[in-house]
């Protein structure tokens, strides 16, 4: 497959050949969804915690005698039915991670890339280099490319000036190619790849 290459100024810079095995698949939403769930589960902190009846700070003595009061039988005021008592079956500190095979994760990334290509939301630029780290200049670059919401993927090493210039622009994320992931691809409108990123992806999946 051939796709036009743009410069950061928005002019044409030839074409690039894209691998069908990476950008030409028929996107499977089920595989992509599994990958997104896996990523979000890994991100979740899991620091939620409530105190059980064994952990609340309250006396453990029996509230009143067992018989003769006409009231319901109770032991400690730590029981879950009382205000200030422990929580029954509450959340505990735990990891929310679950397993997803490495081959499925790799396949999900290829399907996400293919989905962007199929939706005409993939842009290839020749290089991501800025003369200086000025946000105003970077805003002009993204306007020239028609980008308001995008994930920008560079090569293994990002140009420092370009990275700093784009850092404060809302809805624009810049990552090196080794940081590319399904969740970030889907949460942004356009996907911008440098030629170096395309080469690195094809090397990774060959």
UniProtKB/Swiss-Prot annotation:
Segments passing through the bilayer: none
InterPro entries listed in its UniProt record: Ribosomal_uL4, Ribosomal_uL4-like, Ribosomal_uL4_dom_sf
Any matching Pfam family: Ribosomal_L4
MF terms in GO: rRNA binding; structural constituent of ribosome
Record keywords: Ribonucleoprotein, Ribosomal protein, RNA-binding, rRNA-binding
Chain intervals with Basic residues compositional bias: 64-77
Annotated segments matching region Disordered: 63-96
Superkingdom of this protein's organism: Bacteria
SUPFAM superfamilies xref list: Ribosomal protein L4
GO BP terms: translation
Claim: GTP-binding is one of the keywords in the record: no
Record GO cellular component, one term: ribosome
Keyword match NADP: no
Family: Belongs to the universal ribosomal protein uL4 family.
Function: One of the primary rRNA binding proteins, this protein initially binds near the 5'-end of the 23S rRNA. It is important during the early stages of 50S assembly. It makes multiple contacts with different domains of the 23S rRNA in the assembled 50S subunit and ribosome. Forms part of the polypeptide exit tunnel.
HAMAP family: Ribosomal_uL4_B
Assembly mode: Part of the 50S ribosomal subunit.
Protein name: Large ribosomal subunit protein uL4
């Amino acid at each position: 497959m051939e796709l036009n290459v743009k410069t950061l100024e928005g002019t044409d810079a030839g074409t690039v050949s894209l691998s069908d095995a990476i950008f030409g698949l028929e996107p499977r939403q089920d595989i992509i969804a599994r990958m997104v769930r896996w990523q979000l589960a890994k991100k979740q902190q899991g620091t939620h915690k409530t105190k059980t009846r064994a952990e609340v700070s309250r006396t453990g003595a029996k509230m009143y005698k067992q018989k003769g009061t006409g009231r319901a039988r109770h032991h400690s005021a730590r029981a879950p039915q009382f205000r200030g008592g422990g929580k029954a079956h509450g959340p505990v500190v735990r990891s929310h991670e679950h397993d997803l095979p490495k081959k499925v994760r790799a396949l999900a990334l290829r399907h996400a890339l293919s989905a962007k290509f199929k939706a005409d939301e993939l842009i290839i630029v020749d290089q991501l280099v800025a003369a200086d780290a000025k946000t105003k200049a970077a805003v002009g670059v993204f306007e020239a490319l028609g980008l308001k919401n995008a994930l920008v993927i560079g090569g293994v090493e990002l140009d420092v000036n370009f990275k700093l210039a784009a850092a404060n622009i809302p809805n624009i994320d810049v990552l090196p190619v080794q940081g590319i992931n399904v969740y970030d691809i889907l949460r942004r409108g356009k996907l911008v790849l440098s030629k170096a990123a395309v080469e690195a992806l094809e090397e990774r999946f060959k």
